[in-house]
Amino acid sequence: MQPTRRALLGYGALLACPSPTRADDLKDGRFRDEIVTILRGLYPAATISTDDDPEQVHVEAYTLYLGNLHGDLRGRSEAERQRRILAFLTRTMPGGPYPKDSPPPARTEPFAAARARLRIQLVPPDYATRTPDLVTRPFSKRLLVAYALDEPNRYQLITMPMLTAWGIEAGVLDEPARRNSEAEARQVSIEASPTGATGRFATSATEDGYAASRLLLPGFMERVRKALGTPGIIVAAPTREFIIAWTPDSEARARIAKVVRASFHKGPYSRSDELFHSDPAGLRPLTAAELADHGR
């Protein structure tokens, strides 16, 4: 699916128009909307959609992460912006986007090569509603486990047609995805502080799109428990970009639970307001009694 000649000729005028201040245009979605307009002209037959994340756009089988592109364009002339945007789209989707339900065999990366880029993800159920062939499994009432192919400028959630092209079952994805995610998580910082006279809390925030999914990583969660100094902790992932954990004896536990709910409703990148208990045996939802102890 190649860009139309008319579209390519027209983008000099589109990108040369005076642009508003770009201080917050990535976070408020204006930059994404600019890219969507360009994409619709370049690939008029492609299915292009957005969600509540202003830093990404879905183009057929691809999910493009726009943060790096936005940073690269800062301070550039309009002519240079045009050149770099078109170069980014060509590099990210060589040959153009392909439909979700029929990835061309010539472009299907062998699984032996792709497995090094597998990552584990946590996504809301509406992702599966929007893309019915997405490979998922239940995690909690509000979250599904999914799998992604990671790249600097995009990630691609794994779909059933991709499994068919690779000749594998969905169960094959989990082990390498967890292993790769654990390896990356070793470099992720965890900040811990007291919560008044009793208890401690910890946070871990990243902008790589995988902070919430680290709930699924035993090695990372062991680091969080060590930072809090106790074998059993409460943890939540209200948005994609951070997790928060605290000791069960924290005098601020009810207040923290309110912060979790508020962050989930405020977003962006909302994931879940659920509270989980983490210990060496694994992760589980809080019991009714534990929820009541947190004002729930």
State where each predicted segment sits.
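N-terminal alpha-helical "arm" segments
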Residues: 24-50
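Short, low-order "capping/linker" segments at domain edges
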Residues: 284-296
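Short Gly/Ser/Thr- and Asp/Glu-enriched loop/turn motifs at secondary-structure junctions
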Residues: 50-55, 237-241
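Charged, alpha-helical interface segments at or near domain boundaries
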Residues: 38, 55-200
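N-terminal secretory signal peptides and thylakoid transit peptides that target proteins
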Residues: 1-14
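Bacterial Sec-dependent signal peptides at the C-terminal "C-region" and cleavage site
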Residues: 15-25
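A contiguous, surface-oriented mixed alpha/beta subdomain in the mid-to-C-terminal portion of proteins
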Residues: 24, 28-32, 130-276, 284
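Short, surface-exposed beta-strand-loop junctions and turns on beta-sheet-rich folds
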Residues: 63-65, 251-252, 291-293
